Amino acid sequence: METSCAAPTCGRRERKKQRTREALIDAAFRLFQEKGFEATTVEEIADEVDVSSRTFFRYFASKEDVVLTFQEEQFTTMLEALASRPASEPVMTALRNAAVSVLRACEDGTYGFDPERFGCIQQMMESSPAVFGRSLEHGQKKQAEITRVIAERMGVDPAVDLRPHVAAGLSNSAFRSAFEVLSSGVSGTGRFSDVLDQVFGVMEDGLNYLPAEQTPMPETTTPSR
């Protein structure tokens, strides 16, 4: 026999679940910052919230998935920023302005983003292959959503037009390239958003360089609003 649940009761249950989920995320990042990602166990995260490991796994499949909650919020905000860019902007310029503005918001703590948590994620991506791998996997899974928004901006059907797919792929590549450049010390800046801005600038300028041609790196820009 099916059972029903009164709206107020269901509402309380959902709020309790949300509070537990947020408490697990807060505890996880606190431990990640104190001990490091690899040294932190699921059991320790659960103990911080006074729940069992089994309860943790009701909300997250792994420690890596906790990290992805922040990236999911960041990605959603970037899609919204991309959709709101002026229609007159070329696709790569719109992608650049949307991505860089959201990254700077994460770094500066605006729009509700936690800059310390963002910095913690950057450190974990550098030190943990598991976190870096899951981040790349997350980006690949979200590429279809970027493609859809780009196609809507262009007024084309992505089923028959490959340009939205190429632009979305370049966007993902820009994030990966920026991280690799920053990690290797190629760039003199310590801000991820500035390196990402430069990478998008290179993409906008084109990559058909002659072997002996020396061209300056694009300057960092401030996205227009």
Per-segment meaning from a language model:
Residues 1-16, 160, 201, 207-225:
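N-terminal intrinsically disordered/low-complexity leader segments
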Residues 1-35, 39-51, 194:
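Basic, helix-initiating cap at the start of DNA-binding domains
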Residues 11, 35-37, 50, 57-67, ...:
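HTH DNA-binding helix-turn interface
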Residues 24-32, 78, 95, 135:
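Short hydrophobic clusters on alpha-helical segments that form packing/core surfaces
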Residues 32, 41-42, 63-74, 92-95, ...:
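Amphipathic alpha-helical segments enriched in hydrophobic/aromatic and basic residues
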Residues 69, 76-121:
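Hydrophobic alpha-helical connector segments
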Residues 129-154, 165-166:
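Amphipathic alpha-helical packing segments from all-alpha helical-bundle domains
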Residues 156-200, 214:
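Hydrophobic/aromatic-rich alpha-helical bundle segments in the mid-to-C-terminal region
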